[in-house]
Amino acid sequence: MNYLPAPPPGTTPLRVLSIAGSDSGGGAGIQADMRTMTVLGVHACTAVTAVTIQNTLGVEGFHEIPAEIVASQIKAVVTDIGIQSAKTGMLASSSIIAAVAETWLRLELTTPLVVDPVCASMHGDPLLTGEAMDSLRDRLFPLATVVTPNLDEVRLLVGIDVVDTESQRAAAMALHALGPQWALVKGGHLRSSDRSCDLLYGGSSAGVAFHEFDAPRVQTGNDHGGGDTLAAAVSCALAHGYTVPDAVGFGKRWVTECLRDAYPLGRGHGPVSPLFQRT
């Protein structure tokens, strides 16, 4: 696949901010974001929202970082280092979501923002309360350049069970109505097909309202961190000035390669791997 341009040695690279939780198993969250961002040649900045206790078998618990500390991390990065894009992952609580939204507005940020609405872990462990879900929809989605839920998160966010193309389109439109510029409904959890089709919707003002991104399904049980990896790659492409459809297309190709190179780890789901050779 074609990669993003690498910065010349000794020059300052583009900067992308990940606002997410830390995964003690190293498969998802901040750790997955930093791996993809680093391999793609951008400087990864972070604002940690939670410290999780997890491994390949699941999430055993987490410690929420105080909202004011999350906000201060974002401010510290933006006011000194500067960013060309950002992404969110696990935000843990309504107070953290509010702090992220308020800080974004206070700093008058206009850089692209990818919102990966992490509501539950891949093992089904809940990561957001109902109140936090409301904050996510009401406060953060309207600031997002693109939101990137999987099918389980779509069900929690807009109450639609995606079972086919028609319901996937309905879900994308319902998500878009919550305020983001674009809504991406990932089809990776729709196991009834040997294809993985993601659907991007940008509304009537986007010209071509729907964009489909289709790829052969990669058969692997080592898929931990796939959603984080996709969103991180999209953020990197947006930092380079890609349009949202082009950035999502790049992210889809990237995560497909990462799934193909995923490796076993522990006794559960191993991580996707961005460490394949760049040829």
Curated annotation (Swiss-Prot):
Q: In which pathway does it act?
A: Cofactor biosynthesis; thiamine diphosphate biosynthesis; 4-amino-2-methyl-5-diphosphomethylpyrimidine from 5-amino-1-(5-phospho-D-ribosyl)imidazole: step 2/3; Cofactor biosynthesis; thiamine diphosphate biosynthesis; 4-amino-2-methyl-5-diphosphomethylpyrimidine from 5-amino-1-(5-phospho-D-ribosyl)imidazole: step 3/3
Catalytic reactions on record: 4-amino-5-hydroxymethyl-2-methylpyrimidine + ATP = 4-amino-2-methyl-5-(phosphooxymethyl)pyrimidine + ADP + H(+); 4-amino-2-methyl-5-(phosphooxymethyl)pyrimidine + ATP = 4-amino-2-methyl-5-(diphosphooxymethyl)pyrimidine + ADP
- List positions binding 4-amino-5-hydroxymethyl-2-methylpyrimidine: Q54
Q: Which keywords does the record carry?
A: ATP-binding, Kinase, Nucleotide-binding, Thiamine biosynthesis, Transferase
Q: Give the CC-aspect GO terms.
A: cytosol
A single Pfam family it belongs to is: Phos_pyr_kin
Q: Name one GO biological process term.
A: thiamine diphosphate biosynthetic process
Give the family per the record: Belongs to the ThiD family.
Function, as annotated = Catalyzes the phosphorylation of hydroxymethylpyrimidine phosphate (HMP-P) to HMP-PP, and of HMP to HMP-P.
Q: Which PANTHER family match?
A: HYDROXYMETHYLPYRIMIDINE_PHOSPHOMETHYLPYRIMIDINE KINASE THI20-RELATED, PHOSPHOMETHYLPYRIMIDINE KINASE
Q: Per its record, how is this protein called by name? A: Hydroxymethylpyrimidine/phosphomethylpyrimidine kinase
Question: What organism is listed for this UniProt entry?
Answer: Mycobacterium leprae (strain TN)
- State which gene encodes it: thiD
